[in-house]
Amino acid sequence: MTEDSRTILLIGSGPIQIGQAAEFDYSGAQACRALQEEGARVVLVNSNPATIMTDPEMADAVYIEPIEPDAIAEVIEQEDPDGVIAGLGGQTGLNVTAALAEQGVLDEHDVDVMGTPLDTIYATEDRDLFRQRMADLGQPVPASTTIALGDDETATDIDEGALRERVDDAVEAVGGLPVIARTTYTLGGSGSGVVHDFEALVDRVRTGLRLSRNAEVLVTESITGWVELEYEVMRDAGDSCIIVCNMENIDPMGIHTGESTVVTPSQIIPDDGHQEMRNAAVAVIRELGIQGGCNIQFAWRDDGTPGGEYRVVEVNPRVSRSSALASKATGYPIARVTAKVALGKRLHEIDNEITGQTTAAFEPAIDYVVTKVPRWPNDKFPEVDFELSTAMKSTGEAMAIGRTFEESLLKALRSSEYDPSVDWATVSDDELAADYLQRPSPDRPYAVFEAFERGFTVGDVNDHTGFREWYLQRFQNVAAASAAASEGDVATPAALGYTNSAVAALASDGGDVAVDDVAATAPERTFKQVDTCAGEFAASTPYYYSARSQGSTGSDVRADRDAHSVVIVGGGPIRIGQGVEFDYCTVHAVRALREAGIDAHVVNNNPETVSTDYDTSDGLFFEPITAEEVADVVEATNADGVMVQFGGQTSVDVGAPLEAELERRGLDCEIMGTDVDAMDLAEDRDRFNRLLDERDISQPDGGSATSVAGALELAAEVGYPVLVRPSYVLGGRAMEIVHDDDELRRYVEEAVRVSPEKPVLVDEFLADAVELDVDAVSDGEDVLVGGVMEHIESAGVHSGDSACVIPPRGLGDDILARVREVTTEIARALDTVGLLNVQLAVQDGEVYVLEANPRSSRTVPFVSKATGVPIAKLAAKVMAGESLADLDASEGVPEQYSVKEVVLPFDRLPGSDPRLGPEMKSTGEVMGTASDPGMAYWKAQVAASNAPVPGSTAVVDLLVEGLGERFEVVTVKDVPAAIRRGEVEFLVSDDRDALTAAVEAEIPYVSTVAAAEAMREGIAAADGAREAMPVADRPVNDETWG
């Protein structure tokens, strides 16, 4: 068989969720390009419509289908692939490939597993097998033993005495408590943790046996407190191996690496220790027979010997979150090389695209420091304990590059956009030590700064945190620089990594200091190139980071300063309310500009995304998204304009201060598209309400209040219940439905702390209304409606958490015509140039406008996949000066139904409330498409792992006609207890305790009447044909909406 004739199946990772985020969109998109470069025909299957990799042009055939064996088997039947690459779709891709092999599907259709063999995957995921292989190799591993279910046992009916006896034996085998319990074949440390007492360990093992695909839990000796390191290794079929980089966690062992601040290259490991672990990493990857990228985790401690002591903790035989970080940190494209190695290419045969002179066989060398910090959703879940452990809770991460660790750390913290919201003045020294230093949490880095400002010593902080002294000395340097600023020394903190505006604010504590004064004396910010070789070869790829520390003079930026160029601001780290959808929009904007002959430069700091790939744009600037730093990029590139519409709230929020900063510097550069003031008008409820009133556009009664009394007065006028929320937020943060004065008073005084600078919005709650989302593009005159979506959930559930269907099912032509009319009026009233999202509600035949956002929305990718209309690309082109008429753009109404369903993180956040409401909680989404709306909904539930088995036992507490006929409905006194005993397999209820039990037991559930009615329709269609069809082949009518 020749290479050109091969058809390769690439399995994606599915929806964004905690433990598996956008890194697999990046790696999958890179792999698609790499395989096609080698002449392979690529078939891609993924369930996530928000990704670049599911664009129809990314592969020869793109299927948006559930990532589960039956759906993949149907695609295999249709496409007849020669091979499948499992290691590029995360844990989801590995698990489904293993299932297809076990079911005989791969053998039946002669599909080879390419790259890393399945036996190797089993050897790394099965902890006993892994321990034995390491022992054979002579590599030290933590003492461990496996607790497994017997042949006739299940996790719900295992004898309690037998379980306790096995746990007791396991504790004795590894040397006593504390221990680490790890669940096999799971994601992001799910079901894992450090356990200090026996009863907690029994509970953890019971949970782990239920979560594990092969019903096993590994109990290991605790190496908490050791240094955690990761080595990214690459190997080809010819046994050539290289180390891409090593990464060091600042947080000690006991905290998941996805939760830790991570630094590369390693700063504290002695060279002898590094060489020992480097040699071990190569020996391990060779012993296991891994081909392609691989991540090996070590624990290390200083035992007084030159090299210290290490343990091999685990191996990920696939591309991972750390692989994405390593790729962006070094410029070495791990996913691209992995894909080519899977085809049989040797490392020396694969070009290094950054240098253009070397190959993938050359190990990267870096002359800078990279720091990654996670981003947690603790603002969305105040009821959840965010103490960090071996199980992930973070949704995303930010990365920064600097010449020193201090500079890199400050840039990373700035990029994370995290506000600890701690009033340190109210925290005593004892509380600081016990609650913020000893207890690992998202606030801990900031607590370390605070401790040093109070005079804590390095030894004090080391005792409380376990952070190594080398790092603490650098934290202390940052704290000292902050103190120096207040005494008039502005050069030191600026050189260390503070922005001019931050230095001015610090210095103003000792007097009035202007940003111009700081800029005049602070070191200039210059741009350096990421080249994979520490300057040994000239780099041809424009991938940059800024530095302003000593020795950072001279800029490496090689932009054509005479060319028409634009800076596009990305979305930063993934968080709830601002997910990979905005990176999709950013990448489409880049592609649109490049198609138009305009240089496109991206400013972003998320290592997981396609927008931060080195060859996506004409210039990649890995920087925090602040007005000052974006303006520096504008100066370096001589850009004509900046686009802030595509990166979500992060990029929109920087628009006004950036406009002021550009004007302050006298730069001839504009914010392109919709005017910044129009964006503000749409977010300012009073101004927006007046705009709608002037045009006789219906809206819920209400307004904004700047005091408790004002809020109570508004609620009295509108009538309870009312919807309350702060202004200028994304994802419904702090939004609630309140029913009386007491609830409103509590909300205003405690939840948002209303003030004249922070008004609260009080609106009539439209109960039982049908909510709609509209995405549109305007060129300032004409308006193209990209799609109209009908929410499946009733009013009161945030649009980002509601399933929705396109085209709408229950709207008459008159309603659609009014929706179009209202959308067009708003677009023109706001002088919209670019994207516009309008959220509406229909009640008793009246169309009400809830809000409008003249920027990208989270539904843009879904609409584009459903209709085939590339609305983000169209928006970028009209922002660059083209008209919709010039572009010959047209609308399209799909013949099939597409349902977007959300994925919720409750299983990863113990203590969270699983009930849906006006505050957004979902992390990602899936899509189901079929000619029958019921089947589309059912496919979406399968993709979201929330599809019940018809005929299974169910508790139905919500009144939904006909749903119970599909199940064996049981009536129990204590529903949560029955669920935990395994007596309930599907739950229909809005009771928090019952829903929490369903989440813990991982059984399907619905919590609203609307979702239950949709599920009834889905189950009725479940036995029908799945209709797997490539995205590009889905039929669309050349019609207009309304």
UniProtKB/Swiss-Prot annotation:
Name of the encoding gene: carB
MGS-like domain residues are 947-1042
> For Mg(2+) 4, which residues are the binding ones?
851, 853
Spell out the PROSITE patterns in the cross-references. ATP_GRASP, CPSASE_1, CPSASE_2, MGS
> Region Allosteric domain: which residues?
948-1042
**Positions of region (Carbamoyl phosphate synthetic domain):** 559-947
Residue limits of the ATP-grasp domain?
Answer: 131-343, 689-880
Tell me what this protein is called: Carbamoyl phosphate synthase large chain
Q: Where does Mg(2+) 3 bind?
A: 839, 851
The Swiss-Prot or TrEMBL record describes its family as follows: Belongs to the CarB family.
